[in-house]
Curated annotation (Swiss-Prot):
Residues 77-88, 227-250, 291-304 have a biased composition (Low complexity). Residues 427-434 are annotated as: G1. Residues 418-585 form the tr-type G domain. It is found in: Cytoplasm. InterPro entries: EF-G-like_DII, IF2_II, IF2_N, P-loop_NTPase, Small_GTP-bd, T_Tr_GTP-bd_dom, TF_IF2_bacterial-like, TIF_IF2. Residues 305-314 have a biased composition (Basic residues). One of its GO terms (cellular component) is cytosol. Belongs to the TRAFAC class translation factor GTPase superfamily. Classic translation factor GTPase family. IF-2 subfamily. This is Translation initiation factor IF-2.
Length: 916
């Protein structure tokens, strides 16, 4: 069977949902609200229960005598009640909700009409028999109502009670299943007309009554005036106070009977806002027309003459308030100030007038106004003059992240727990650092590095014996010195890996220096012991020369011989790391807000700015507001070294985060703030300071460096744009290019950034005539098309030293070429031939080297160069040839020279470009 909801049943029978719910509960149905469903049979039961309750009651005939007695009884009872409750002064009626009353009356009228229709259908015969009695009774009721109308209108409260009784009666009447809107509209209109009629009739009778009272008061006053003048004056002053309503009514024109009109003109002296059907009238923006017929002549105006007083009288009679004396405030004993406080602020703090402080400053020789800022020295002198001990307020710089790393009270010693050691693997190029890390993590990351060089720092975490170890892998190339220095600053232990066959190399020495500068213990891993030429003892001896002495030799450095390729002695190396970490007692407070260091940063095309962070103290959570270097943001997502999403990062944990508005610099510190607003303010302030610092580094032209600046204009430059995959590579590449030393040419890095090569880079390169160098990145398809159209050169590389070589060659090519003279042969003139219109031909024999067609020639006579020029033609017998070898004969002509003589020496030479 189908089900129906309770509100559908209520809609069908014209009932409220609340009544349907109550009826259903009374019938024993389990329902909760109007949206509950019931079976079809239960729905019929509910409808039938309402049908039974609305059946009309039998009409009991009422005799004319009973009706007259009832009406007479009601009128007799109403008269003493009205007489007893009628006050001396008519009270102002309270506002009522007329709209709700009108709807209730209309609803009651509609239900009454419908019930009357049903009664007519059921009791048609009975109604026909009593038709005469009903008509006669209706006529009697109309007469009774007409007689009692005046008494009902005398008291407004009775009228209101009458409406309330009618409303209660209408509510008690049963309602039909359907609602007649036409009947409701007719009842509404009839009620409005009746209301207007009652108001009009009430006003008419009130006006008549006021007129009679005014005439009586006037006649009484006239009689009293004839008897005694003082008594009249007293009565005249008392009359307006005793009857303010009556006197005010006289000023209005005589009331007219307007009962036949739908709405009479409202009485301006009374408030009829309660009779407005939609509530009180809003007369805020309407003009006041209560006295619109009065003459408004300003010169002859006599309004309020009795109450007017002259200015002199008002001034003399005014009660002058005594001047309140200012309370004397004691000066404070101490005053905490900030530099730049104004005079007004100081006056407010010490409870003194600004004029007093300005006067004191003037006596001290300082000209100031109350809105002028004062420096610290002036404020202290002023406080000394007042006898107040002044001390400057120490303001905490919220933009200073470094304070979290040096403040002792930031960490709670009671909450300190043991943390994982951070280990940095350092060593020379291709000594096996990434291979060792690959062996530790059981992955093949090492094979993916180009040229055997780790291009950027990687941070990984492994577990050994139930304890975690965090590893940082640093590049070995000389260009990545700054990255190795950053790695040493955040590490706890350094693993110095040295190849057993190569020994100590330049980057090995550099790694030792970084570790010693950071005061980090060194564990030496001698790698490649599986090779035939391995000599670990030689490595130990070489390291001892640089201060890294083995514990076997009485030093403090642990030495472990390993083979990263075959995994030999790896467990021993990890145990050594944990042993050194245990000696150091590494601890962190996980309860504070997280602080740490940026290991690496890059710009991802889909994710935006991505930063690899190492949490050093506290715990980093997703959605934490964070300031990283000179940028800020909120941690949107966080992934660990395995690429898995995590929500929490404990101390010594490397994570990669997204949500920053820019890519930070590698090595920057980060800190979590209490809310995003504070983080934004700190980040913007740090960015502003960095920009200001960068501008201050810009050199200005002065008389001292003017000559150097003009001379620098002669120096040519190679403009380059650097784009790399990570920030560390960008820094290293830019630093390496700037170090290239080619006389007369310098490198100018126009722009460097992280991310793929895009259209804006092409536009910038075209405008600045620059070469774009992409390091481990590729141009977008749109950028590639634009580069081809604009003829912009893009060089893509994955190994840094190849980039350096290529740029160095380009720099050398920008210099003007230098040539040197190279003598390739000599010849002796044996005979000369003069040909008309051609010139002099010299027959020669090559005595040394060779004579070529494109070479230059000098004519030497008696050891003196008489001419230097180019060959016009070269022949061997009658054939034109390119060269004539040693011992051969030939003929030649020299451009613009015909004075060749026998025994002249011809020296052939070429100009060769000197390679730089």
């Amino acid at each position: 069977m189908s089900k129906k909801r309770l509100y559908e049943i209520a809609k069908e029978i014209g009932k409220e949902s609340k009544e349907i719910v109550e009826k259903a509960k009374s019938l024993g149905l389990e329902v909760k609200s109007h949206a509950s469903s019931v079976e079809e049979s239960d729905a019929k039961r509910i409808v039938e229960s309402f049908t039974v309750s609305v059946e009309p009651k039998a009409v009991t005939p009422t005799s004319k005598v009973e009706k007259e007695a009832k009406a007479q009884e009601g009128s007799v009872a109403a008269e003493p009640k009205a007489a007893a409750t009628k006050p001396a002064g008519r009270p102002r009626p309270q506002n009522r909700n007329f709209k709700a009353e009108r709807e209730a009356r209309a609803k009651a009228e509609a239900e009454r009409r419908q019930n009357n229709g049903e009664r007519r259908n059921q009791n048609k015969g009975q109604n026909n028999r009593q038709k005469d009695n009903r008509n006669h009774g209706s006529q009697d009721r109309r007469n009774d109502n007409r007689n009692n109308r005046n008494r009902q209108n005398d008291n407004r409260r009775d009228n209101r009670n009458h409406f309330q009784n009618r409303q209660e009666a209408s509510k008690s009447q049963p309602t039909g299943p359907r609602f007649d809107f036409k009947a409701r509209a007719a009842a509404l209109k009839a009620e409005q007309n009746a209301e207007y009629s009652r108001q009009s009739e009430t006003r008419f009778h009130e006006a008549q009554e006021a007129k009679r009272q005014a005439a009586q008061a006037k006649e009484k006053a006239k009689k009293l005036n004839q008897k005694e003048q003082p008594t009249v004056e007293a009565a005249a002053t008392a009359a307006p106070q005793a009857q303010p309503q009556t006197v005010e009514q006289v000023t209005h024109p005589a009331a007219v009977d307007t009962r036949r009109k739908k709405q009479a003109r409202p009485d301006k002296s009374r408030d009829f806002s309660h009779e407005n059907e939609d509530g009180p009238k809003q007369n805020k923006h309407k003009k006041n027309r209560n006295k619109q017929n009065q003459v408004r002549n300003q010169k002859n105006s006599n309004w309020n003459k009795k109450n007017k007083k002259s200015k002199n009288n008002r001034n003399h009679n005014a009660n002058l308030k005594p001047v309140t004396e200012r309370k004397f405030h004691e000066l404070p004993k101490e005053f905490e100030y900030t530099e730049g406080m104004t005079v007004a602020e100081i006056a407010k703090r010490i409870k003194r007038e600004p004029a007093e402080i300005v006067k004191k400053l003037f006596m001290m020789g300082v000209m100031a106004t109350q809105n002028q800022s004062l420096d610290a020295d002036t404020i202290e002198l002023l406080m000394v003059d007042y006898g107040i001990e002044a001390h400057q307020k120490v303001e905490v710089d919220t933009a200073d992240i470094e304070r979290f790393f040096v403040e002792d009270d930031y960490l709670n010693p009671k909450n300190m727990v043991e943390r994982a050691p951070v280990v940095t693997i350092m060593g020379h190029v291709d000594h096996g650092k990434t291979t060792l890390l690959d062996t530790l993590r059981n992955s093949r990351i090492a094979t993916g590095e180009a040229g055997g060089i780790t291009q950027h720092i990687g941070a990984y975490q492994i577990e050994e014996g139930g304890k975690k170890i965090t590893f940082l892998d640093t590049p070995g190339h000389a260009a990545f010195t700054s990255m190795r220095a950053r790695g040493a600053s955040v590490t706890d232990i350094t693993i110095l890996i040295v190849a057993a066959d190569d020994g100590v190399m330049p980057q090995t020495i550099e790694a030792i220096n970084h570790s010693k500068a950071a005061d980090v213990p060194i564990i030496v891993a001698i790698n490649k012991i599986d090779k035939p030429g391995a000599n670990p003892e030689r490595v130990i001896g070489e390291l001892a020369e640089y201060g890294v002495i083995s514990t076997a030799w009485g030093g403090d450095s642990e030495f472990v011989e390993i083979s990263a390729k075959f995994g030999q002695n790896i467990e021993e190396l990890l145990e050594t790391v944990l042993l050194v970490a245990e000696i150091q007692e590494l601890k962190a407070d996980p309860t504070v807000r997280a602080i740490g260091t940026v290991i690496e940063a890059r710009l991802d095309k889909g994710k935006g700015a991505v930063a690899t962070l190492l949490v050093q103290q506290g715990t980093l959570h997703v959605q934490d507001p964070i300031v990283v270097g000179n940028t800020f943001g909120r941690v949107r997502a966080m992934t660990n070294d395995l690429g898995r999403r995590v929500k929490v990062a404990a101390p010594s944990t490397p994570v990669s985060i997204t949500g920053l508005n820019e890519a930070p610099m590698a090595g920057d510190h980060f800190a979590v703030y209490e809310d995003e607003k504070a983080a934004r303010a700190a980040g913007e302030e740090r960015a502003k300071r960095a920009l200001l610092k960068q501008r201050q580094l810009t050199h200005r032209v002065s008389l001292d460096n003017l000559f150097d600046t003009l001379k620098a204009g002669e120096v040519k430059s190679v403009n380059v744009i650097i784009k790399a995959d990570v920030q560390g590579s960008v820094e290293a590449l830019a630093a390496s290019l700037l170090k290239i030393d080619v006389e007369g040419v310098k490198v100018n890095v126009v722009h460097s950034a992280v991310g793929a090569i895009n259209e804006s880079d092409i536009t910038l390169a075209e405008a600045s005539n620059a070469v774009i160098i992409g390091f481990n990145v590729r141009p977008t398809p749109q950028a590639r098309q634009q580069a081809e159209a604009d003829e912009v050169e893009i060089r893509l590389h994955s190994i840094i030293y190849k980039v350096i070589e290529e740029v160095e060659d380009a720099m050398k090519g920008m210099l003007d070429p230098e040539f040197e003279e190279k003598i390739i042969g000599e010849a002796l003139i044996r005979e000369t031939f003069k040909v008309s219109k051609v010139g002099t031909i010299g027959g020669f024999m090559v005595t040394n080297g060779k004579i070529t067609r494109d070479s230059s020639a000098r004519v030497i006579r008696d050891g003196v160069v008489v001419f230097d020029g180019k060959l016009a033609s070269l022949k061997h017998y009658k054939d034109d040839v390119k060269e004539v070898g040693n011992g051969q004969e030939g003929g030649l002509m020299i451009e613009n020279y015909n004075d060749i003589k026998i025994d002249d020496t011809i020296e052939a030479y070429i100009m060769e470009e000197i390679k730089r």
